Amino acid sequence: MTTSFPAHFARQYDSHLKHLKLKGLQPKTIDAYARAIRRLGGYFDYRIEALTEAQLTEYFSDLIGTHSWSAVKLDLYGLKFFTTHVLKKPWAMPDLIKPPKTQRLPDIVTVDEAQRLFLATRVLSYRVFYFTLYSLGLRLGEGLALTVADIDAERMRVQVRDAKGNRDRLVPLPQATLAVLRRFWLTHRHPELLFPNRSAGLKGAQRASSPLDRGGVQLTLRKVATA
């Protein structure tokens, strides 16, 4: 049991963690929902079992001033999970917050749009990454998580790990994509990561401990796609 919290909150928090794990959620989702309850607990002196709408309105108003809308939404989702699974109460405040609408990039691009994207991207890592996503039909997170071992050149397929629904899947590997990936790998020669982080430059890519930065990839994609 967690000992750094008051006893009543520690029991609730431990129950929250158990329910999160039993639901088979992704580790990053578990971390976010757990952090939400810790933050709420700290704000309300660890008494969060009977919060009113007025109290939560005040909490989220303060949170918006110091955190991103993404963090605000995750705290809301974490509280909703806690309310329904730990407190066993119905969630009665669906309209508590309303994030501003954002312009999202299309999930599917045409062949012409994809070609313009590849040609307009100046950074080699991003260009190869976008080409790989498009040719294999991967999501952003799936592409970032690719490793050298996931590429099966003999059977011409790619193993995508922890895909949607926490399931692994196999996708066909086009010959052109294999050729591009092989040439690209020669530029960094990382023993594991297919798209190593370039924060330390090309020479440091071989020793990178993480893949390309998700935020940097999204920002570059948005700039190119909306140019």
Map each language-model feature to its residues:
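Conserved catalytic core of the tyrosine transesterase superfamily
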Residues: 1-227
